Amino acid sequence: MQYPLPIAHLIDAYMRLPGVGEKTATRLAFYTMDMPEKDVEDFSKALIQVKNDIHQCPICGNITEKEVCDICSNPNRDQTTIMVVEQPKDLMAFEEMGEYDGLYHVLHGVLSPMDGIGPEEINIKSLITRLQKNDDVKEVILALNSTPEGESTAMYISKLIKPAEIKVTRLAAGLSVGSDIEYANSITLKRAVQGRTAL
């Protein structure tokens, strides 16, 4: 059966979301049609607002609606430690843990030559520039996911930082191979940070 064009377009739009297949997209489209008009308007406004008002912090790459994110602008954070993560959602996981009070640097991806993602496509250059300009940093924690891409990215960054004589550490074993940091519980993350090892 062919759906009317507006419904087909909405189904197609939902299918662009990760993990959403045609059946789920169709259910969401019909659910959206049954929503009160005000809820649909609020939903569409929220989508537009996120695209218009959220940007990357120019210092660390975290997402923010301010000029500089709350973490970078907080003088009470430990200025001597920077934790490098893949995505803002990983940063949020460590913040929810509540044990780490240093700074962050968000790469927005990992090296993946097969996908055409090299050092220029993620925030590696800005990390090195940041370290060169900041003498306060004594340790960089590489908190990347335990995937082949995450491992190779960690080794690449480690080699770039070593000449600066800054301590480079990585999370302790405890996160299962291939698992995402965002799904790890707070206790696992806390142990991984506390037991971090030098590279």
Curated annotation (Swiss-Prot):
Statement: the UniProt record of this protein carries the keyword DNA repair: yes
Keyword Zinc: yes
SMART domains for the chain: TOPRIM
Keywords: DNA damage, DNA recombination, DNA repair, Metal-binding, Zinc, Zinc-finger
Annotated PROSITE patterns: RECR, TOPRIM
CDD domains: TOPRIM_recR
GO MF annotation: an example: DNA binding
Residue ranges of every copy of the Toprim domain listed in the record: 80-176
Entry-linked Pfam families: RecR_C, RecR_HhH, RecR_ZnF, Toprim_4
InterPro entries hit by this protein: DNA_Rcmb_RecR, Rcmb_RecR, Rcmb_RecR_Znf, TOPRIM_dom, TOPRIM_RecR
Gene Ontology BP terms: DNA recombination; DNA repair
Zinc finger (C4-type): 57-72
Known role: May play a role in DNA repair. It seems to be involved in an RecBC-independent recombinational process of DNA repair. It may act with RecF and RecO.
Family designation: Belongs to the RecR family.
Name of the protein in its database record: Recombination protein RecR
Taxonomic classification: Bacteria, Bacillati, Bacillota, Bacilli, Lactobacillales
Gene, per the UniProt record: recR
